[in-house]
């Protein structure tokens, strides 16, 4: 499975380690301080997103450009942000949760299965 990481802080690095342990290919990562990285990032089967609100606009552009599915645990999203994710869900598979413990459980199960 090809994985793109959106948000490369503590959580992003942990997800990278788990993905690599499972034999998944991490095709790249981007973060808020460098939003232009989303513009040139390669497509993936799924984007694992633990970034921040500031990354949402470039992230949505990346997902639409590459037709990559999204699993996100980003918190602090506004109603318009959630509406944008819901709209994206009409085009691509999208899973979002703001509860980190639930999000981690989902990621662990995904990585285990």
Residue ranges and their predicted role:
Residues 40-58, 68-74:
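Rossmann-like NAD(P)-binding element
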Residues 54-57, 61, 74-99, 105-113:
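Rossmann-fold NAD(P)-binding glycine/threonine-rich loop
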